[in-house]
């Protein structure tokens, strides 16, 4: 069995992330570690409570636990594994959609994502459904 050299974990609710963000995260991780070193790079959520991206090498170097308030426990877990975590602050990865406030932040940010297009479509349908002419 061959062990994975590294593992990148991203949640599915970060609609602003782009390929360049992933490349930048990989570059930050490589720069912080050097080839073959054990390393842990994390991108916190905008409120610094959650963990919105983790790049770990080797893949199983640090046990992961996601959910509410996972950022600080992930930092502590890396340190318990004798790895000093690298924190990368990346705004497009930092914004996840967990609450209505997160959704408002997303809608306030300029973007042309599929998520935004779908939300705009839903908003128009809701507006049409609630208009006086639609309710008769």
Where do the PLM segments sit?
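Short aromatic/hydrophobic "clamp" motif used to bind/position activated sugar donors
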Residues: 7
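Conserved alpha/beta core of the MobA/IspD/sugar-nucleotide pyrophosphorylase nucleotidyltransferase superfamily
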Residues: 69-71, 76-136
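Phosphate-binding/catalytic loops
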Residues: 54-65, 89-93
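Conserved catalytic core of nucleotide-sugar-dependent glycosyltransferases
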Residues: 37-60, 69-70
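Short, high-confidence coil segments that cap the C-terminus of an alpha-helix
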Residues: 3-4, 37-40, 83
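Conserved donor-nucleotide/metal-binding helix-loop-beta segment in metal-dependent transferases, i.e.
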Residues: 14-47
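Active-site acidic Asp-centered loop
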Residues: 10-12
């Amino acid at each position: 069995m061959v062990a994975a050299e590294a593992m990148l974990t991203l949640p599915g609710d970060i609609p602003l992330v782009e390929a360049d963000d992933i490349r930048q995260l990989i570059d930050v991780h490589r720069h912080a570690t050097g080839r073959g070193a054990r390393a842990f790079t994390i991108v916190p959520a905008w409120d610094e409570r959650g963990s919105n991206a983790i790049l770990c090498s080797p893949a199983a170097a640090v046990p992961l636990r996601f959910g509410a308030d996972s950022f600080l426990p992930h930092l502590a877990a890396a340190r318990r594994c004798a790895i000093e975590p690298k924190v990368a602050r990346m705004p497009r990865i930092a914004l996840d959609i967990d609450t209505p406030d997160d959704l408002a932040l997303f809608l306030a940010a300029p973007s042309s994502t599929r998520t935004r297009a779908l939300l705009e479509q839903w908003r128009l349908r809701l507006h049409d459904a609630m208009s006086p002419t639609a309710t008769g």
